[in-house]
């Protein structure tokens, strides 16, 4: 099986994964279901690899996935999620060849018993 359908149509699934990828880049740690985290991991690994490349084409490819979200930094300046990926996150992993994310099981969700995990950047 190449991918999970996650109970959605293709455009809904793509939009959800874009939102999750942007949230993970901005917050560096999110809680989601296990199936979503496994699909999200594929996308984020590719984004960080693009960030490590750092050229204009890689930046444009990453911009097709990430949403245009402004982030307020500690020093009162703002930057976009794409800038954070290329300036803050990608330089951390110059020596690492893949494996940029970690998932930790949290337990079942109270409402429907779905297995929840925390996915974070290593």
Curated annotation (Swiss-Prot):
Source species, domain of life: Bacteria
Pfam families, A to Z: Ribosomal_L17
Is the keyword Calcium in the record? Answer: no
UniProtKB keywords: Ribonucleoprotein, Ribosomal protein
Molecular-function GO terms, alphabetical: structural constituent of ribosome
Any single biological process term in GO: translation
User: What are the annotated GO cellular component locations?
Assistant: cytosolic large ribosomal subunit
What does the sequence similarity comment in the record state about its family?
Belongs to the bacterial ribosomal protein bL17 family.
Indicate the quaternary assembly. Part of the 50S ribosomal subunit. Contacts protein L32.
Q: Mind telling me which HAMAP family this protein's record contains?
A: Ribosomal_bL17
This chain belongs to which protein, by name?
Large ribosomal subunit protein bL17
């Amino acid at each position: 099986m190449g991918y999970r359908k996650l109970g959605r149509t293709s455009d809904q699934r793509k939009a959800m994964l874009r939102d999750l990828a942007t949230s993970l880049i901005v917050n560096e740690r999110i809680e989601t279901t296990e199936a979503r985290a496994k699909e999200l991991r594929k996308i984020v690994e590719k984004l960080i690899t693009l960030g490590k490349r750092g050229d204009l084409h890689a930046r444009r490819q990453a911009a097709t996935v990430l949403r245009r979200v402004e982030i307020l930094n500690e020093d009162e300046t703002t930057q976009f999620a794409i800038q954070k990926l290329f300036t803050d996150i990608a330089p951390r992993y110059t020596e690492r060849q893949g494996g940029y994310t970690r998932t930790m099981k949290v337990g079942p969700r109270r409402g429907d018993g779905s297995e929840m995990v925390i996915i974070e950047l290593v």
